[in-house]
Amino acid sequence: MKKVDKTYLKSLLETPSVTGSEVKVANLVRERLADTADEIETNVMGSVHSRLKGKGNAPSVMISAHMDEIGLMVTYISDSGYLSVAAVGGVDAAILPGMRVDVHTESGTYRGVVGRKPIHLIEPDERKKVTPLENLVIDLGMPAKKVKKIVRIGDVITFGVGFEKFGKGMAVSRAFDDKAGVYIITRVMEELKEAGGAQGDYICATTVQEEIGLRGGTTSAYGINPDVCIAFDVTHATDYPGIDQSKHGKLLCGDGPVIARGPNINPVVFERLCKAAKEEGIPFQLEAEPRVTGTDAGAMQIQRGGKATGLVSIALRYMHTPTEVICLQDLEATVALLKRFILDLDEDVSFVPGV
């Protein structure tokens, strides 16, 4: 397996792409794959579809990963110049007070802070309560007149942090959900190209608006109409204190890709993913999904007449916080798994269960 391209990964993670504002990351993807893909098209939603044409008649495979990240949106500017905000996606209000944030405007990006009364001024009974998001404000440290000049209602805000390596082989950043996936599925295309291509088409679908309802994955799967749809997304690591593994499963950072199994997953796709991992000598983990998953796989499976669908993940600690943590070696291990899965397909494979 190759080393992680940390420069590319860092650029993805630190480029803002709050749901509905994914254009800058889409530009990075188009630039990255410009000399690799045979075709690149962007649909009206903003999802980028990069296609590597196959050499034969094997099933076409679309792998999706969403470009959007959670964040905040400006809803009101007070006469004093403070910003009120709403969540875009699943933001935990409990982690926001005292945080540095970046406000993205037409004229540039401005650092702000989420205000918090000092503990000395908080009543004892108030200290134990989470301040609702609608009661939090962002301070830009500017006169109100300037704030109202540069900030517009609807401007988006990201956590004011970026990519760092730490510990042994680990990394921390905002937005590994799901820019880790964007990294992986673009790298899969590069690896397939280097290998001379597959027998069927590979479509790298970097999608939009997953965090508010799987909207990009839905429209991409319908529009492209591939034979096989695989979603890549992060899943919850359960290897830190406070997580009940008997309830949530045992999933460890650094123990390899996670392959989902359940009614949302085509059984042939599942078995072939496991077989590919074994062929490549890649350690992998299994995750039980007894219901429809909350990933693009949930939407892609029921497009048109139904799609042979899979879900591959890596274990991630502290999802939807500014300090999401992954093991870097899991990235390229997943690239190798997905590459092997695609290369193993031929025109005789059937994804109809039991046939």
Can you say where each PLM-predicted feature lies in the sequence?
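N-terminal hydrophobic/helix-forming segments and targeting peptides
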Residues: 1-355
